Structures are given as structure tokens and as C-alpha cells.
Amino acid sequence: MQRFDALMQHNSVGSVQLRGMTAAQANVVQRYAIENTRLGIPYLFSEEALHGLMTNNATSFPQQIGLAASFEPELGREMGHAIAAESRACGIHETYSPVMDLIRDPRYGRAEESYGEDTYLCAEFARETVLGMQGTDLTTPDTVAAEPKHYVGYGNPVGGLNCAPCTMGRHDVFSDCLPVFEAAFADGKACDAMCSYNSIDSIPVSMDHELLTDVLRGQFGMPGFVRSDLTAVSRLYDWHFIAETPEEAIRLSLIHI
């Protein structure tokens, strides 16, 4: 705990990764945040949980593409609830899931993470999975906040290459991809969102005001925050070459959410 105290007191730490932690360990860290930081803001413990919580001894369910092959969206709700219960038992409050990417290119190496290529089927599973995770009361000990990803157009990259620009134009993104997220946010009431690395019509999603604010918040009613997918913000500087500095990349993202 002394090492942790030194780390938190003398560094600008934005997040701490504690994979495989127990609820007891999470409580120790949480108590430190509340009692020893200037504002006393509790930490939000989040984790990957695509088809099961990413930790030892958690239940591993079929990948989403396998679940979608059942054509039974209610199974998504059952899986979501089971994942939520196991996550909360480990001290996790939020999951980086479910994946809402619509896959139209079989070369894409992460196709198994999605619910497939059909907008309607993906939307049905999206809503049910979120409802299973969040339930009707997030204060109960068997629910977590859902963070659907990757918003948006991430599953259709040029050449099937991960993170590459989306091959779909805005018309196809709005008509095919966004209804899946609408089901998760407007119907399922998902709390937060994770934005994607890709660009659509040369505009990086991580700084797309129309998608992040007008659509996600204005139309879909997303109440929480937008999390950048790992380096999605810094890539405005060293990948998309739009920002002149890393600081400018941060500014461009913040002013558009």
C-alpha cells in the first residue's frame, strides 16, 4: 500500500489496471481513493467481459457470433446477467461490452466478437445483453454498467485490417450500424460508450461531433461518458495526423463530446 500511495500522490494517474483482483482488494483501493485523494472521488472499476469476465475462474460463454447463431436474443440477456453478477462479485462496476460492431467483411480478424452482419439481429442482441447486464436497478449487487463498443463503424475496415478507416460512408453507417447502438442506448439504456479508432469519410470518430454528441447524446439519450478506446485520442496526432501535438489531440476530442 505504501507503493500505491507513492504512485498516486506524486503522479498524474488516470487509470490503474488491476486484472484478476478480488472484491476485497478493490475495496482497499477504493477506500484509499475516498479517504486520501483531494476530491475523494471513488474509482470506477471496469473490465473486459465480452463473453465472460476476463479474470481467472470466471464463466466463459460462447463468443457473441456463436450466441447470435442461436437466433435467441433472450440468451444475450441471460449471459449479460451472469456476467454482471460475476463482475460485481469481483468488485467490477462496469464492463467494456457488449461489442456492437456490424461485420460485413469476413477478412476482419475480430469478427467473432460481434453478433454478425444483420442489423436487426445485432440490435435485438444488443438491447437484450445490455438489459441483462444493467437490470432495472444498478444499485443491486448483481448488475453492472454496460459500455457498448466500438462506436461506430469499426467492424468494416479497409482490407479487413483492424483500426483501418471504415469502408462504409455515412449513409450506410447511419442506416446499418447506428440502429444497433440505438437499441443498446435508447432501448437498453446503456450507461456509457466506447468510441472507436477508425475514421468515417476521413473524420476520426473520436472527434466527430455529430456522432458523439448530436446522435449519441441527443438522439439516443446516452447519459454517461464516452471512453476512448485505448489510444483513440492520441491517434489524432500520430495516426490520423490531424492534431499537431498530443495536447491538441486531447483538446479536439474533448470539444466534440
Locations of regions flagged by a protein language model:
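Glycoside hydrolase catalytic-domain context in secreted enzymes
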Residues: M1-I255
